[in-house]
């Protein structure tokens, strides 16, 4: 905690400023968590506007890998959030599911992805790699897996 408050002070936000806006450390963590989920969810819409459907899906899945990496770093603190604020976690899950379902639906409609693809399977595969303890470079593995998943999701001709 000391390092956290010292590093915030160096960047111009003293602990008093933080606690004026967030009454507790948990409130700050919840705000950060919500913001990260909202950024991930809105990235899906932004990517869909400027990239082809399969490339938008691929790019979003790579952002999802980064999101998981950030969650792993703050996992001990997140356990309190999960226990005390299950509605926050459920709302976040819904936002993430909506984002990937929209991207997959767009890719299916364009004919670039198979019609039998379940978007949650993509997320589950990446989360699974992130939680294998024997993979020290899981992020690189997950990034390679994204390309494998996209290639394997193409329609069979």
What is each residue range found by the language model?
Residues 94, 98, 102-116, 128, ...:
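C-terminal peripheral helix-coil segments that are non-catalytic and often amphipathic
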Residues 10, 27-46, 55, 59-66, ...:
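Alpha-helical structural segments
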Residues 120-121:
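Short coil-to-helix segment of the ABC ATPase nucleotide-binding domain corresponding to the Q-loop/switch region
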Residues 51-78, 104, 109-116, 136-139:
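Helical hydrophobic small-molecule/effector-binding pocket
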Residues 39, 43-47, 125, 129-132:
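Solvent-exposed, amphipathic alpha-helical segments
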Residues 1-27:
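Helix-turn-helix
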Residues 27, 59, 63-99, 127-135:
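Short secondary-structure transition hinges
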Residues 45-49, 62-68, 81, 149-153:
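Helix-loop "lid/cap" segments that line or gate small-molecule binding pockets
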């Amino acid at each position: 905690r000391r390092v956290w408050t010292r590093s915030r002070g160096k960047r111009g936000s003293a602990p008093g400023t933080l606690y004026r806006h967030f009454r507790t450390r948990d409130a700050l963590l919840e705000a950060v968590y919500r913001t990260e989920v909202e950024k991930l969810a809105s990235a899906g819409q932004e990517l869909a506007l400027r990239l082809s459907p399969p490339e938008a899906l691929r790019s979003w899945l790579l952002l999802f890998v980064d999101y998981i990496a950030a969650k792993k770093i703050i996992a001990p603190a997140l356990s309190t959030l999960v226990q005390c604020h299950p509605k926050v976690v459920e709302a976040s899950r819904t936002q993430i599911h909506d984002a990937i379902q929209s991207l997959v639906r767009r890719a299916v409609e364009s004919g670039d992805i198979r019609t039998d693809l379940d978007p949650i399977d993509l997320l589950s595969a990446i989360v699974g790699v992130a939680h294998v303890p024997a993979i020290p470079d899981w992020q690189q593995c997950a990034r390679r897996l994204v390309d494998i998943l996209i290639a394997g999701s193409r329609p069979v001709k």
